[in-house]
């Protein structure tokens, strides 16, 4: 039975001078360091002789830019799938790291009622469902080969927790999904047999700033 690997990559460092929670807002492309992270991933896939047959990205600019070097390396187009988009969040557009008082206003207390769902944004179950559907679609189309899928930290973390049969609710600071990281899902037929995690740009992450660094070496973007 054929073996298929779907490499799910988080985008590189984002150009966000005002330190806002950019979420699904338009714009917000990569910094020079972010572009270097994207190139590092492409070089890593080529050097490891990954048999990339498709490159699919979230429609957000930072994800498309991250996917571009790999697409060029393999002579492919970057396809977009809205199911790979960042998670919705009621605090989108606000400088939540530099002004923590925004999170303490009585008007937002209602968003903390259910952290398991979570009540401040898109439900984890919905994120897991759309990410699973997106990856399953790519799996069907690249049987016996490999693909690169570029998404965002929360969706990738939620998908990984779902695949490992862990609870979907989690603390953002615990996420093991650094900028430019690749979480690879390997299937035999339709059966998931292995999940691996790599950081081709680990040295660059240590120089980066991230709105949600998780457990990475990136600095907290303020």
Regions found by a protein language model. Name each.
Residues 57-58, 129, 150-151:
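Short beta-strand scaffold positions
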Residues 47-51, 138-145:
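Glycine-rich phosphate-binding loop signature in dinucleotide/nucleotide-binding domains
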Residues 4, 9-79:
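Active-site-proximal alpha-helix that buttresses catalytic centers in soluble enzyme cores
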Residues 6, 145-153:
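Generic beta-sheet signal
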């Amino acid at each position: 039975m054929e073996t298929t690997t779907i490499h799910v990559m988080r985008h590189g460092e984002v150009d966000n001078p005002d330190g806002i929670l950019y979420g699904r807002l338009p714009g917000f492309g990569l910094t020079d360091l972010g572009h270097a992270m994207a190139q590092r991933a492409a070089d890593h896939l080529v050097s490891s002789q990954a048999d990339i047959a498709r490159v699919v990205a979230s429609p957000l600019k930072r994800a498309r830019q991250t996917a571009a070097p790999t697409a060029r390396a393999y002579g492919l187009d970057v396809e977009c799938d809205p199911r790979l988009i960042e998670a919705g969040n009621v605090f989108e557009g606000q400088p939540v790291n530099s002004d923590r008082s925004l999170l303490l206003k009585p008007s937002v207390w209602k968003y903390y009622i259910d952290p398991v769902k979570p009540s401040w944004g898109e439900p984890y179950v919905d994120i897991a469902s759309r990410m699973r559907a997106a990856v399953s679609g790519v799996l069907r189309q690249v049987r016996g080969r490999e693909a690169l899928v570029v998404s965002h930290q929360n969706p990738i973390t939620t998908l990984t927790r779902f695949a490992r049969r862990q609870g979907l609710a989690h603390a953002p600071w615990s996420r093991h999904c650094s900028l430019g990281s690749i979480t690879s899902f390997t299937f035999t037929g339709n059966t998931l047999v292995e999940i691996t995690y790599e950081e081709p740009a680990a040295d660059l992450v240590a120089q980066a700033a991230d709105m949600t660094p998780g457990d990475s070496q990136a600095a907290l973007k303020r």
